[in-house]
């Protein structure tokens, strides 16, 4: 079948338009960005070439990060480190200049730890968030539970003006038994406690889609492994990194994957492809 020049031009225009609107969003807890860079993070980014990157757990101040190296890859970069050196911190890298960037939740005790950054693109917002871990003891577990409730309140308020959200990051919670290698032995472990899992269910029920589970219901898909006992080589992991998508923009999702072959951290990246 032969197509007219006009038809071919239309197909070309449409394909280019489609390619330009498809975005690949990667979320990655790097467990120290300087250490990840030393393990080849920049070369990996150059090859994978995502449109938006959400980093968590920078463990570095902005002046300690080779920002120009990321900019050389074509990114506008936005960094929100913790005030405490060598701890926490989030970032958002983007090929497209956002309309607006918001740093933190305007709650000092959380913003001090560099937990959240948001970029707005038209009527869609992308958030990089690092939920606290409670594994160090009761005090931090209590802090985590308070944070979770405050974060949900923040999101519910944000949705009144910015209803189309993509919330990427390390949630430090496995949602269901399928998301952890040993749900029985870990039933009393921080990250799989009933109250944490109940919160994540409420979060999703408030109007979000777990993008990975939308496309994949298979077990043994994890995003974090302990450094102990060769856990990663044995795939004894936890799925605690998510890219949550607001229900109104669920139809824009095209694919969501876990990328365990990337080994710059004790986590691996997760990726989401969307039309916007």
Specify the residue positions occupied by each region the protein language model found:
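N-terminal, active-site-proximal structural segment of metallo-dependent hydrolase catalytic domains
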Residues: 6-72, 76, 82-88, 103, ...
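Active-site-proximal beta-strand elements of phosphoester/diester hydrolases
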Residues: 23-31, 123-135, 168
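Active-site beta-strand/loop signature of hydrolases that rely on acidic residues for catalysis
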Residues: 28-29, 45-63, 126, 155-177, ...
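Metal-dependent phosphoesterases centered on the DNase I-like endonuclease/exonuclease/phosphatase
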Residues: 52, 73-76, 149-236, 240
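Structured beta-strand-rich core segments of catalytic domains in phosphoester-bond hydrolases
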Residues: 58-61, 66-134
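Conserved beta strand-loop-helix elements of the APE1-like EEP
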Residues: 85-101, 219, 230-251
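Active-site beta-strand termini and strand-to-loop segments that position acidic
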Residues: 95, 119-122, 246-247, 272-276
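Surface-exposed cleft-lining segments at the edges of enzyme active sites
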Residues: 106-107, 132-148, 184-188
